[in-house]
C-alpha cells in the first residue's frame, strides 16, 4: 500500500514548471494555494467604497455621524446622480406642461368660452340685436341669391367600384390666371358631361388674362358667386357707361376722385370686358345655394363669409363679399384682420346646432350648413368641419385649388402651382 502524505505539513515551494510536476504534486500545489491564500472576494474593489460621490457631505470625520439620520438620508439622495437626472426630467416635463397650458390649452378654452357667450341669446338682447337680424337693403343690379339646379348634384350614395356619376368642382380665386386654370382642369380630369364647375369669386383682376378666365367659365356653363373684385370692376364698368367714359380715353381726362380711386389697370380691365362677359358676371349671385350634400348638410358658396344665425335673405351683400373677421358681441363683420375669424364663430354655431339635433331628427347633419368660400389668401387652404376656404394665393405664386365632391359626399382636394404675377401689378 502506498504511503500517505500529511497535506497539512506541506509548504509552498517554487516549482520550475507545472508541466514537469507529477499529477499528485500539481494537485497538492493547487490545494495549498486555495488553502493559504486570501479568499477571492477580498480582492474585489468596490468603487462606491472610495468614491467621493457616495461620501456624506456633513464634513465630519466620521461621515456625518453627528447629523440627524434624516439629514444624512436626504443628503445622500440629493447627491445621487440618478436623483439629479430624474429631477431634470421632471422639471422639463413640468415646464412643458406649463407652456402647453399657457400657449395652447388655456387660450383655446378661453376662446371657446367667448364663442359660446357670443352665441348666447342673452348676449343678443344685451347688444340690442345682432347684425343682420333686420332686413338688409338690397343692392340694385346685384343678384342676392340663386339656387343650383339639382341635376348637377352628385348621387346620395356612391356605388363601390364605379366612378362617380356626377361631380361638383369648386375652384378658389383664379384672379385672371387662365393658364393655371386650364392646368387644374387637366389635373382633375374635368369632364364637361358629368362635372359642374363652381367658382368662389374673384375670377378676374390682378392676373394676366381675366377675359380668358370668364370665357372659359362661360364655355363650360359654370356657376359662380360675386367676389369683391368682380363687384369693383362691374361697378366701375357701369359707372363708365353712365358717364360716357367707357370708350378708351386718356386717364388724364378722368377726375382723380372718380370711380372710387381705382387704378389704371382696373379701369383698363373694365373697358376690356365685353358686354357678354359683363352680363355673365352680373348674373353671378352673392350667395349660391348648392343644396343638400351627404355628410355636409346644406352647402352654400360665397366669396367672403356669412354671419351665423342670420337668414340668408338678410345677409348683407357687401359683408358677404368682403368679411374676414366678426365682432363677438354684435356680430358685425369686418373686412379687416385682427379680430375673431368669422369661420371660428360659424363652426361653433353649427357644432352647437348639430348637437341640439342629435336624437331629435334621423339625420342631424341635414340641419347644418357648410360654407365653401374664397377671399382669404393669407390663411390659404383652410378645411374645417363647416367651412372650406379655397383661396390659396395663386396670383402671388401660390397654388390654385379645386375641391371635388363626388357621389356620397366624398371630398378631395387637388392643387396646381402658379406663377407669381404679383410683381407685374
Residue ranges and their predicted role:
Residues 196-201, 260-264, 339-344:
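Short, basic, glycine/proline-bearing loop/turn elements
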Residues 210-300, 304-336:
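Active-site neighborhood of divalent metal-dependent phosphoester bond hydrolases
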Residues 167-173, 299-305, 388-390:
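Active-site-proximal beta-strand elements of phosphoester/diester hydrolases
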Residues 2-145, 317-425:
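Acidic, His/Gly-rich catalytic cores of divalent-metal-dependent hydrolytic chemistry
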Residues 173, 202, 217, 227-228, ...:
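Divalent metal-coordination and catalytic microenvironments
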Residues 175-179, 205-208, 231-234, 308-309, ...:
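Active-site environment of divalent metal-dependent phosphoester hydrolases
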Residues 114-212:
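N-terminal active-site segment of His-dependent metallophosphoesterases
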Residues 162-168, 290-300, 384:
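Beta-strand-turn-beta hairpins that frame and shape the catalytic cleft
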Amino acid at each position: 500500500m502506498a504511503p500517505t502524505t500529511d497535506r497539512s505539513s506541506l509548504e509552498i515551494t517554487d516549482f520550475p514548471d507545472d508541466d514537469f510536476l507529477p499529477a499528485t504534486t500539481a494537485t497538492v500545489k493547487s490545494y495549498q494555494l486555495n488553502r493559504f491564500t486570501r479568499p477571492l472576494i477580498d480582492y474585489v474593489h468596490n468603487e462606491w467604497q472610495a468614491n467621493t460621490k457616495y461620501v456624506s457631505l456633513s464634513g465630519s470625520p466620521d461621515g456625518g455621524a453627528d447629523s440627524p439620520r434624516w439629514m444624512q438620508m436626504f443628503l445622500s439622495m440629493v447627491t445621487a446622480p440618478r436623483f439629479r437626472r430624474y429631477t431634470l426630467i421632471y422639471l422639463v416635463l413640468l415646464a412643458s406642461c406649463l407652456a402647453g397650458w399657457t400657449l395652447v390649452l388655456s387660450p383655446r378654452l378661453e376662446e371657446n368660452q367667448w364663442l359660446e357667450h357670443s352665441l348666447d341669446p342673452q348676449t343678443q338682447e344685451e347688444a340690442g340685436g345682432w347684425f343682420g337680424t333686420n332686413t338688409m337693403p338690397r343692392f340694385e343690379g346685384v343678384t342676392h341669391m340663386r339656387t343650383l339646379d339639382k341635376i348637377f348634384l352628385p348621387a346620395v350614395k356612391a356605388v363601390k367600384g364605379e366612378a362617380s356619376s356626377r361631380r361638383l368642382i369648386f375652384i378658389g380665386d383664379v384672379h385672371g390666371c387662365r393658364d393655371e386654370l386650364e392646368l387644374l382642369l387637366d389635373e382633375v380630369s374635368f369632364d364637361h358631361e358629368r362635372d359642374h364647375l363652381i367658382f368662389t369669386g374673384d375670377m378676374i383682376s390682378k392676373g394676366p388674362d381675366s377675359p380668358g378666365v370668364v370665357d372659359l367659365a362661360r364655355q363650360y356653363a359654370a356657376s359662380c358667386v360675386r367676389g369683391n373684385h368682380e363687384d369693383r370692376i362691374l361697378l366701375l364698368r357701369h359707372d363708365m357707361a353712365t358717364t360716357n367714359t367707357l370708350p378708351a380715353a386718356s386717364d388724364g381726362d378722368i377726375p382723380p376722385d372718380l370711380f372710387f380711386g381705382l387704378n389704371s389697370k382696373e379701369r383698363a380691365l373694365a373697358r376690356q370686358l365685353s358686354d357678354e362677359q359683363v352680363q355673365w358676371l352680373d348674373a353671378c349671385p352673392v350667395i349660391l345655394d348648392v343644396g343638400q350634400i351627404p355628410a355636409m348638410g346644406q352647402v352654400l358658396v360665397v366669396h367672403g363669409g356669412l354671419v351665423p344665425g342670420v337668414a340668408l335673405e338678410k345677409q348683407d351683400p357687401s359683408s358677404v363679399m368682403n368679411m374676414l373677421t366678426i365682432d363677438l358681441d354684435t356680430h358685425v363683420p369686418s373686412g379687416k384682420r385682427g379680430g375673431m375669424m368669422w369661420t371660428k364663430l360659424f363652426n361653433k354655431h353649427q357644432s352647437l346646432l348639430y348637437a341640439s339635433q342629435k336624437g331629435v331628427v334621423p339625420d342631424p347633419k341635414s340641419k347644418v350648413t357648410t360654407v365653401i368660400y374664397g377671399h382669404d389668401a393669407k390663411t390659404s387652404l383652410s378645411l374645417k368641419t363647416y367651412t372650406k376656404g379655397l383661396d390659396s394665393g395663386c396670383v402671388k405664386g401660390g397654388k390654385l385649388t379645386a375641391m371635388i365632391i363626388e357621389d356620397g359626399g366624398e371630398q378631395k382636394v387637388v392643387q396646381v402651382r402658379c406663377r407669381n404675377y404679383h410683381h407685374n401689378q
